[in-house]
Amino acid sequence: APDDYYDLVFVVVQAGQLPDVLPVLKANKSQYFVFVGNNPQAKQVLEFMQRPADKIAFGFQGTAGRREHDHVVSVYASAGMTVGGATTPLSGTFRTRLKTAFDGAKYKLTFYGDMDEWLKCHIAFVLPACYVCYACNGDLHRATKQQRGAILDAAYEACLMLKDAGIPVNDANNTDNFQPGTSARRKMEAMVFTMTKTPLGRLCVSDHAMHAVSEMKYLDEAFDALRRQTGTAMPMWEKLRNEMPSWDSLQQNRKAAK
């Protein structure tokens, strides 16, 4: 209800579901909101909420898992969240409020100054991995060496596209890791190999991709809109997209599996 007041409001829904809940959140008199999850449009959400930039945060929790019939299987190295403002650091007041909320919970908060950039760069890697997952019918063990390399090549292209779109990409944490021929790229190749050959890949990529087709489609459409604006050449990205089944068929298969 609009008159309900909370010290912190955590919004944990898929980005494509936000249009249904944003009007309700905007009408609420609470001041501090944290939108958690993959979101390619943090700046637009901030604008819609019509609140000061230091009252709206965006976060990403580094966990994974899947639903079984009667329970949830989850995996995490350590519980925590990367969190910050859409394009500016959170105020000291907001940081203190977040730290107080998780005090004693063994939950690590990593503050970041530009979460719109962070989230877009995260999606730049997530989507190519999902494209390959769909091409392999959810079984990343089937991914070839060429496909594993293509994930990183496509992520590199996506980072260049984001820079063309005016996004201040943190190259050290993103572009440099994907650039062919570098030591950082070789480390990423080892990580992707592990991701495709161990149960960790199923939990971190396959389960999410296969159970959240609508979310991935939404992210894909958001990135495609950006790509059309920039005109950046992304041949490997396009190749991976063309090798996966259509979004309609993936959604139909998902409905049939329920």
PLM features per residue range, with description:
Residues 116-159:
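Active-site-proximal catalytic alpha-helix in oxidoreductases
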